[in-house]
């Protein structure tokens, strides 16, 4: 499970508060020592409309050529174009199955960002052609996340280019606490969160589950051992009587 989560999301994300992330920091030796891949991205929440059905989605945007650097795109279960062209969209396997959407189909994406008209504020709508289908191995990701070109996303959601996130893919994603400490030293004015922060409740639940299972197994072993010892004790007593 952890491997799938790490494989789908960036290991750490740097968000800027008020201005673009400094290029000097991005090119720093300290960051290059930690990471093996850096990508700029942006995201927004919208609604997919297809064949009379609607579905809320988290849309993530990448540049045309950077999209193919994601692990899910390199995955052998990925089908379609590995470039993220303008006016095209990449959706998950679960979403494709549930809505009967195939590569080449058109879908409508609605944004909460409005267009001012004489009758009031209307939400933006754009039509995209499904260009690829990914399979992360986690149904929650596959049915709730989609990818579009980052420029299309920023136009659709009225997002500022300077507020793009920096996604950091670490050389050793399991040493996340050490990496976060180092990243805070590099990006001291920005907000940093990691894959561990995003999934804290899930990992806490898994830890509790492991502890409970350990206790249950320990009790089963103790009861089984007690039964074996009791059985042997009774057998020895019976044999002792027979010998006597």
Model-predicted segments: where are they?
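Hydrophobic alpha-helical transmembrane segments of multi-pass inner-membrane transport and secretion
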Residues: 1, 207-244
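Hydrophobic, regular-secondary-structure patches
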Residues: 1-58, 65-68, 79-85, 184-185, ...
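Short aromatic/hydrophobic contact patches that present stacked aromatics
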Residues: 13, 88, 165-167
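Flexible glycine-/small-residue-rich
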Residues: 16, 59-63, 111, 132, ...
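Solvent-exposed, non-transmembrane alpha-helical starts
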Residues: 20-26, 49-51, 56, 67-72, ...
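Hydrophobic secondary-structure segments that place a key small or acidic residue at a functional site
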Residues: 42, 79-150
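Mechanotransmission and gating elements of multispan inner-membrane complexes involved in transport
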Residues: 121-213
């Amino acid at each position: 499970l952890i491997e799938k989560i790490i494989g789908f999301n960036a290991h750490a994300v740097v968000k800027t508060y008020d201005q673009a992330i400094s290029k000097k920091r991005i090119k720093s030796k300290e960051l290059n020592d930690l990471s093996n891949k850096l990508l700029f991205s942006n995201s927004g929440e919208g609604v997919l409309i297809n064949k009379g059905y609607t579905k809320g989605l988290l849309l993530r945007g990448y540049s045309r050529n950077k999209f193919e650097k994601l692990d899910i795109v390199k995955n052998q279960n990925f089908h379609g174009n590995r470039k993220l062209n303008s006016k095209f969209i990449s959706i998950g396997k679960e979403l494709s199955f549930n809505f009967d959407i195939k590569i080449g189909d058109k879908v409508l994406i609605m944004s909460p960002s409005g267009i001012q008209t004489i009758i009031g504020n209307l939400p933006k709508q754009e039509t995209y052609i499904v260009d690829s289908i990914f399979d992360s191995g986690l149904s929650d990701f596959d049915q709730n996340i989609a990818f579009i070109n980052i420029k299309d996303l920023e136009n659709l959601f009225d997002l500022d280019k300077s507020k793009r996130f920096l996604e950091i893919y670490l050389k050793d994603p399991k040493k996340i606490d050490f990496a976060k400490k180092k990243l805070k030293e590099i990006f001291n004015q920005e907000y940093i969160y990691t894959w561990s922060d995003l999934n804290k409740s899930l990992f806490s639940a898994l830890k509790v589950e492991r502890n409970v299972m350990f206790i249950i197994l320990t009790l089963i072993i103790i009861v089984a051992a007690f039964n074996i010892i009791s059985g042997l004790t009774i057998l020895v007593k019976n044999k002792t009587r027979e010998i006597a």
